[in-house]
Curated annotation (Swiss-Prot):
InterPro entries attached to this UniProt entry: EF-Ts_dimer_sf, Transl_elong_EFTs/EF1B, Transl_elong_EFTs/EF1B_dimer, Transl_elong_Ts_CS, UBA-like_sf
Leader peptide range in chain numbering: none
The keyword Protein biosynthesis is assigned to this record: yes
Superkingdom of the organism of origin: Bacteria
Annotated CDD domains: UBA_EF-Ts (cd14275)
HAMAP family: EF_Ts
Keywords, sorted A to Z: Cytoplasm, Elongation factor, Protein biosynthesis
Protein name: Elongation factor Ts
Length: 299
């Protein structure tokens, strides 16, 4: 009998097994989904694949900064549900992973997972995460991180219990006044989500593309060619004010820009990282489609 994609999708949803494994299981059980579930369990495929194959798009973003504010890390660790993200054991794992990263020389997630765990020389980081998966009962994934070292000082901010995290590298004197300014800047980044620090960080290719788009818009609107250049210039200024942190109106006082606020307080921003929980993670529907296409392309 023919095996439908609908049945494969349902079996995959129930077991977490791959497309080809689900197709084979349905073929072996004449399309009986319940029997196919048992088949996969007997083969050990369902039990092994279910947790590791599920999409982990919840979790937490965490920021960890050394006492002297010279070193810091921002990290995203994913779980499957918001419920587990609020679990004390999960929170403890995220904090410990952050502490490990503060001591790590790794520059990628793959490198980190192979490292010896900072609290147990007989285990690697991957083993610690697998133990947490077994204990908590959900797939857990160390997704990404960024490490900072500075001659200035670092400022972090966590929004909504770990839904958004920001880490900012700042040059200047650290005191009560500049600490408040730095925190306000971090909160601004969390709220407004600038794509760049300054205009200098935008590639010439991107700038030229934006200019071309605006020029085409003006031509399509019938604007005289001799004034289009000036109009495009004005639109580019607006573009910079939307995507560049230093050009943006400060969220707490829109009469000044972030750049002016920094300058007035004798500070300089060297860089920043903003993580939003789950951004860019494909959900299950898209994941299934991608896997099907992958198998089709193997033919």
């Amino acid at each position: 009998m023919g095996i439908s994609m609908k049945d494969i999708k349902e079996l995959r949803s129930r077991t977490g097994a791959g497309v080809l494994d689900c197709k084979k299981a349905l073929a072996e059980t004449n399309g009986d989904i319940d029997a196919a579930v048992e088949y996969l369990r007997e083969k050990g495929i369902a039990a092994a694949a279910k947790k590791a194959g599920r999409v982990a798009a919840e979790g937490a973003v965490n920021v960890y900064i050394s006492d002297d504010r010279k070193k810091g890390v921002i990290v995203e660790v994913n779980s499957e549900t918001d419920f587990v993200a609020k679990n004390d054991n999960f929170k403890d794992l995220v904090n410990k992973i952050s502490e490990h990263l503060m001591q790590s020389d790794a520059n990628s997630v793959d490198e980190v997972l192979k490292e010896t765990w900072y609290q147990d020389s007989e285990k690697d980081v991957n083993t610690i995460i697998k133990e947490a998966i077994a204990s908590i009962g959900e797939n857990i994934n160390l997704r990404r991180f960024e490490k900072y070292e500075t001659n200035g000082f670092l400022q972090g901010y966590i929004h909504m219990g770990g839904k958004i995290g920001v880490l900012v590298d700042i040059d200047g004197e650290f005191n009560d006044s500049t600490r408040k300014v730095a925190k306000d800047i971090a909160m601004h980044i969390a709220a407004i989500n600038p794509r760049y620090l300054s205009r200098d960080d935008i590639s010439e290719e991107v700038i030229n593309k934006e200019k071309e788009i605006y020029k085409e818009q003006m031509l399509n609107e019938g604007k005289p060619e001799h004034i289009i250049g000036q109009i495009v210039k004005g639109k580019m200024e607006k573009y910079y004010s939307e995507v560049c942190l230093l050009d943006q109106a400060f969220v707490r006082d829109e009469d000044i820009t972030v750049g002016k606020l920094i300058e007035d307080n004798g500070l300089k921003i060297n860089g920043f990282t903003r993580f939003e929980l789950g951004e860019g993670i494909e959900k299950e529907e898209e994941d299934f489609a991608a896997e099907v296409m992958k198998e089709v392309n193997k033919k």
